[in-house]
């Protein structure tokens, strides 16, 4: 019963799509009608500007943290309950019932979830993801790699139930990224050079 309650708490908080909130309140626009049509951080940032993308990301991180903290204090930090809460947020964010089950891809959500679950392993996974973003110049494959790696780590160190939950979340992300994955392997994927972007911001790009 604890696990079900945790899942439900996560799902309903996950339904809060800050991409929709930010763009509709401040820009009076619907992000699903622009760019990739995805109500998530990347699309908002790409179409409307980095400021709005960052604001969206902060909102998605906040709802994830809220769900995890609620479950943490209700069930005294039980890891299995936290796993279900995180999965619930991923499900709610990816398949919100009020938006015809069309949501975001869950990168920000999963990033905070894995750090909250095990901050050392989570940070290592994110650093690996960042390294892959830099060398691959791609934003699709790295989050899938770090989530798969974290799933394996969790399975080995915390048992098959925990590992399976994170693996399910990884499969959800793969489903949400399915078009981007095809584009990547067919050479149509968008290239993002993070180092060049940083250098431009610092005014040292030549």
Swiss-Prot record:
<dbReference type="Pfam" id="PF02660">
    <property type="entry name" value="G3P_acyltransf"/>
</dbReference>
<keyword id="KW-1208">Phospholipid metabolism</keyword>
<keyword id="KW-0812">Transmembrane</keyword>
<keyword id="KW-1133">Transmembrane helix</keyword>
<feature type="transmembrane region" description="Helical">
    <location>
        <begin position="81"/>
        <end position="101"/>
    </location>
</feature>
<keyword id="KW-0472">Membrane</keyword>
<dbReference type="GO" id="GO:0043772">
    <property type="term" value="F:acyl-phosphate glycerol-3-phosphate acyltransferase activity"/>
</dbReference>
<comment type="function">
    <text>Catalyzes the transfer of an acyl group from acyl-phosphate (acyl-PO(4)) to glycerol-3-phosphate (G3P) to form lysophosphatidic acid (LPA). This enzyme utilizes acyl-phosphate as fatty acyl donor, but not acyl-CoA or acyl-ACP.</text>
</comment>
<feature type="transmembrane region" description="Helical">
    <location>
        <begin position="54"/>
        <end position="74"/>
    </location>
</feature>
<keyword id="KW-0443">Lipid metabolism</keyword>
<dbReference type="GO" id="GO:0005886">
    <property type="term" value="C:plasma membrane"/>
</dbReference>
<protein>
    <recommendedName>
        <fullName>Glycerol-3-phosphate acyltransferase 1</fullName>
        <ecNumber>2.3.1.275</ecNumber>
    </recommendedName>
</protein>
<keyword id="KW-0808">Transferase</keyword>
<comment type="pathway">
    <text>Lipid metabolism; phospholipid metabolism.</text>
</comment>
<keyword id="KW-0594">Phospholipid biosynthesis</keyword>
<feature type="transmembrane region" description="Helical">
    <location>
        <begin position="114"/>
        <end position="134"/>
    </location>
</feature>
<feature type="transmembrane region" description="Helical">
    <location>
        <begin position="155"/>
        <end position="175"/>
    </location>
</feature>
<keyword id="KW-0444">Lipid biosynthesis</keyword>
<dbReference type="InterPro" id="IPR003811">
    <property type="entry name" value="G3P_acylTferase_PlsY"/>
</dbReference>
<dbReference type="GO" id="GO:0008654">
    <property type="term" value="P:phospholipid biosynthetic process"/>
</dbReference>
<keyword id="KW-1003">Cell membrane</keyword>
<comment type="subunit">
    <text>Probably interacts with PlsX.</text>
</comment>
<feature type="transmembrane region" description="Helical">
    <location>
        <begin position="7"/>
        <end position="27"/>
    </location>
</feature>
<comment type="similarity">
    <text>Belongs to the PlsY family.</text>
</comment>
């Amino acid at each position: 019963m604890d696990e079900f309650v945790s899942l439900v708490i996560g799902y309903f908080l996950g339904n809060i799509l800050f991409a929709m909130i930010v763009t509709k309140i401040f820009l009076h626009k619907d992000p699903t009608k622009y760019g990739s049509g995805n109500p998530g951080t990347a699309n908002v940032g790409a179409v409307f500007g980095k400021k709005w993308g960052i604001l969206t990301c902060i909102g998605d991180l906040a709802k994830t943290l809220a769900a995890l903290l609620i479950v943490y204090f209700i069930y005294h930090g039980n890891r299995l309950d936290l796993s279900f809460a995180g999965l619930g947020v991923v499900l709610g964010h990816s398949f919100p019932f009020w938006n015809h089950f069309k949501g975001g891809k869950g990168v920000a959500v999963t990033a905070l979830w894995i750090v909250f679950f095990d901050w050392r392993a989570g940070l290592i996974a994110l650093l690996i993801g960042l390294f892959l973003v830099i060398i691959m110049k791609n934003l699709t494959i790295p989050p899938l790699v770090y989530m798969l790696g974290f799933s394996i780590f969790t399975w080995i160190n915390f048992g098959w139930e925990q590992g399976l939950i994170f693996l399910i979340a990884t499969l959800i992300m793969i489903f949400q990224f399915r078009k981007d994955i095809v584009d990547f392997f067919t050479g149509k994927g968008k290239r993002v050079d993070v180092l060049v972007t940083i250098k431009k911001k610092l005014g040292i790009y030549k």
